[in-house]
Curated annotation (Swiss-Prot):
It comes from Chlamydia trachomatis serovar D (strain ATCC VR-885 / DSM 19411 / UW-3/Cx). Belongs to the TRAFAC class translation factor GTPase superfamily. Classic translation factor GTPase family. LepA subfamily. Keywords: Cell inner membrane, Cell membrane, GTP-binding, Hydrolase, Membrane, Nucleotide-binding, Protein biosynthesis. This is Elongation factor 4. The keyword Oxidoreductase does not apply. The gene is lepA.
Length: 602
C-alpha cells in the first residue's frame, strides 16, 4: 500500500440496471489503473461466480482498491461494487454507506431503468456525489442528449459532468477516473480516535474462516487488536490479520486507517456472527455510539426444498450449510412432508435470490431437487387475540379460529414504453394492484407507481411484465405494510386424500381458477391406474374443482369364447367389486414429474 493520506482516498460505488455495463466498466477501470496485468484479465473480473458471469449480474458485492497517478499525486481509489438487483437492496444501502460518491451508469440506448432508479434514490438519501456515465455511446441507437434530459428531469441530477463512454472500446475511461478524483469528496477526517468500522460484507474462506469486509470510519484496526461487534453485542475476537483487495484479497502489514477499505480475519467460523451493517470497535477503547442504519436482514420469500432421491438428504443438508456460510440472508429449517419426505424450509430475500440458490445447489453439488411454490409471510389474527406469522400452508390454523388474515404489500415502480400502458394496467389489475400515480419519464416512456400484494409479485409477475411489454418493461419494489386480505388454504385431494405438497395459500378470488388449473395439470401427469382416480381442489372441505383420471381397461372376458352371456356377466361383476375394493384400499403412486410439473406451473 502507498503512504497514507486521507485526502487522497476516494471511496465510490457503481449503480446500474442489469446489463447496462457495470462489470465491464469495472474491468476497464482495473486495466487503466494497472491493478491487474493484461494477461490475467478476463471478462467480468469482479464477478467471481460462474453464475454471475452467465447471467450478467452481480450477486455478491466485490470491493477492489486501485492506485492512480493524477497531477503528481498518488490516489487510492476504492471501488465497492454493489449487487444491482432489488432483492439485495439492504446490501446495496450498506455498500453505499461505505462510499462518498457513485457512478450512475446508464445505457445510452435504453435510458434510465427501474432498478437504477431505486439505487439512485438510496444514494441520494446518503448524500453521495453522483457522476452520470452514459455507456455504450458507440451504439448506433445511442441518444446521449435525450437520456441526459431524462436523468435531469426525472432524477433531478445535474448532468453538466456527464461522461460519455464505451466500456467496449475504452472511450471515456480516463475521464471517469479523473472525475472520481475531482468530484468525489475524500473521507471526512475523523472526529474521534476510537475505532469505528462499518461491515459491508463478509466471505467464508475454508482456510482462514470468515473474512470481514470493512470501511474504517475512525481510528485504526491492526493485527493483535481485540475487537467486538456493537449491534450484536457478542463475544470479542482477536484480529489475526488485515488485508486489502488488490484485486484479490491480499494480507498486508500495518493497519487499516480512517477512510480505508479492506478486510480482517479473526478466527470467526460462522457468517451469522458477522452481520452486514454492524459496527466494529475495540474492546480496550470502544466507540461510544454504533454507526446508524443497522438492520437485521429478514427473509421475504419462503419455499420448501426436497431431494428427488431421498438418499440425497444428507448431501442436500451439507450443500445448504455450505451456501449459508457465504449467505447470511439464507435461512434453513428442517421439515417433513407426507408426500415429499424429508427436506428443508428455506427463506430468501426475493425471487432472484431463490433462483440463484436453486441453481447453485444443482450446479455446484450436482443434486436433483424439487422446490415447492414460493410463498410469503402471512399474518393470522385469531379470535382469542393472538397473532401468528405463517409462511407454510401446513401451519394454517383451523378456519373457525381465525378472526382475519393480512398479507404483505409492496410499492412497485414500473418503467415502460407508452404503447404498453394498457397491457400493464390490465396485468396489475389481474394481480389485485392499486394504481398510485403515472409520470412521464420522457416523450416515449412512463413510470407507473402501484401497490401490489407481494404474493402476486413472487409468482410470475416479472415474466408476465416482460411478456406484455415485449421485454422493454422493468420494475423494482420495496416492502410496504400488511393489509387485510381474504387469504384461504387451497387443498388438492388425490383419491380423497389431501397431498400437502400441492396445497397453497391463495386469495379467495383466485382459488377456483388456481384449483382447476392444478387439477387439469395433474390429470395429464399422473399415469392411469386400474381404478378411477378423482382429483379435487377443496377449500375448507368444500370441493371447488374436480377432474377424473379414467381407469385402465382390462378385458376380463378375453378367455370366454362364445357361450352363455351370464358367464361374462359374472366376470364383469367380480371385476367391478375388485375395482371398488382397490379404490378403497389402493394407493395412488404420484411420480416425481407430477410434483415438478405442478410446481413449475405455480
Amino acid at each position: 500500500m502507498k503512504p497514507y493520506k486521507i485526502e487522497n482516498i476516494r471511496n465510490f460505488s457503481i449503480i446500474a440496471h442489469i446489463d447496462h455495463g457495470k462489470s465491464t466498466i469495472a474491468d476497464r477501470l482495473l486495466e487503466s489503473t494497472s491493478t491487474i496485468e493484461q494477461r490475467e484479465m478476463r471478462e467480468q473480473l469482479l464477478d467471481s461466480m460462474d453464475l454471475e458471469r452467465e447471467r450478467g449480474i452481480t450477486i455478491k458485492a466485490h470491493p477492489v482498491t486501485m492506485t492512480y497517478e493524477y497531477e503528481g499525486e498518488t490516489y487510492e481509489l476504492n471501488l465497492i461494487d454493489t449487487p444491482g438487483h432489488v432483492d439485495f437492496s439492504y446490501e446495496v444501502s450498506r455498500s453505499l454507506a461505505a462510499c462518498e460518491g457513485a457512478l450512475l451508469i446508464v445505457d445510452a440506448a435504453q435510458g434510465v431503468q427501474a432498478q437504477s432508479l431505486a439505487n439512485v434514490y438510496l444514494a441520494l438519501e446518503r448524500d453521495l456525489e453522483i457522476i452520470p456515465v452514459l455507456n455504450k455511446i458507440d451504439l448506433p441507437a445511442a441518444q446521449p442528449e435525450a437520456i441526459k434530459k431524462q436523468i435531469e428531469e426525472f432524477i433531478g441530477l445535474d448532468t453538466s459532468n456527464t461522461i460519455a463512454c464505451s466500456a467496449k472500446t475504452g472511450q471515456g475511461i480516463p475521464e471517469i477516473l479523473e472525475s472520481i478524483i475531482r468530484l468525489v469528496p475524500p473521507p471526512k477526517p475523523p472526529q474521534e480516535t476510537e475505532l469505528k468500522a462499518l461491515i459491508f460484507d463478509s466471505h467464508y474462506d475454508p482456510y482462514v474462516g470468515i473474512m470481514v469486509y470493512v470501511r474504517v470510519i475512525s481510528g485504526e484496526i491492526k493485527k493483535g487488536d481485540r475487537i467486538t461487534f456493537m449491534a450484536t453485542k457478542g463475544s470479542s475476537f482477536e484480529v489475526l490479520g488485515i488485508g486489502a483487495f488488490l484485486p484479490e484479497a491480499t494480507l498486508m502489514e500495518g493497519s487499516l486507517r480512517a477512510g480505508q477499505v479492506g478486510y480482517f480475519i479473526a478466527n470467526l467460523k460462522k457468517v451469522k456472527d458477522v452481520k452486514i451493517g454492524d459496527t466494529v470497535t475495540t474492546v480496550k477503547h470502544p466507540a461510544k455510539e454504533p454507526l446508524e442504519g443497522f438492520k437485521e436482514i429478514k427473509p421475504v420469500v419462503f419455499a420448501g426444498i426436497y431431494p428427488i432421491d431421498s438418499s440425497d438428504f444428507d448431501t442436500l443438508k451439507d450443500a445448504l450449510g455450505r451456501l449459508q456460510l457465504n449467505d447470511s440472508a439464507l435461512t434453513i429449517e428442517q421439515e417433513n412432508s407426507h408426500s415429499l419426505g424429508f427436506g428443508f424450509r428455506c427463506g430468501f430475500l426475493g425471487l432472484l435470490h431463490l433462483e440463484i440458490i436453486f441453481e447453485r445447489i444443482s450446479r455446484e453439488f450436482d443434486l436433483d431437487i424439487i422446490a415447492t411454490a414460493p410463498s410469503v409471510i402471512y399474518k393470522v389474527v385469531l379470535k382469542n387475540g393472538k397473532t401468528l406469522f405463517i409462511d407454510n400452508p401446513t401451519a394454517y390454523p383451523d378456519p373457525a379460529l381465525i378472526e382475519h388474515m393480512e398479507e404483505p404489500w409492496v410499492h412497485v415502480n414500473i418503467i415502460t414504453p407508452q404503447e404498453y400502458l394498457s397491457n400493464i394496467m390490465s396485468l396489475c389489475m389481474d394481480k389485485r394492484g392499486i394504481c398510485l400515480k403515472t409520470d412521464m419519464l420522457d416523450q416515449h416512456r412512463l413510470v407507473l407507481s402501484y401497490e401490489l400484494p407481494l404474493n402476486e409479485i413472487v409468482s410470475d409477475f416479472n415474466d408476465k411484465l416482460k411478456s406484455v411489454t415485449k421485454g422493454y418493461g422493468s420494475f423494482d419494489y420495496r416492502l410496504g405494510d400488511y393489509k387485510k386480505g381474504a387469504i384461504i388454504k387451497l387443498e388438492i385431494l388425490i383419491n380423497d386424500e389431501a397431498v400437502d405438497a400441492f396445497s397453497c395459500l391463495v386469495h379467495r378470488d383466485k382459488a377456483e381458477s388456481k384449483g382447476r388449473s392444478i387439477c387439469e395439470k395433474l390429470v395429464d401427469v399422473i399415469p392411469p391406474q386400474l381404478f378411477k382416480i378423482p382429483i379435487q381442489a377443496a377449500i375448507n372441505k368444500k370441493i371447488i374443482a374436480r377432474e377424473t383420471i379414467r381407469a385402465l381397461a382390462k378385458n376380463v372376458t378375453a378367455k370366454c369364447y362364445g357361450g352363455d352371456i351370464t358367464r361374462k356377466r359374472k366376470l364383469w361383476d367380480k371385476q367391478k367389486k375388485g375395482k371398488k375394493r382397490m379404490k378403497e384400499f389402493g394407493k395412488v403412486s404420484i411420480p416425481n414429474t407430477a410434483f415438478v410439473e405442478v410446481l413449475k406451473m405455480e
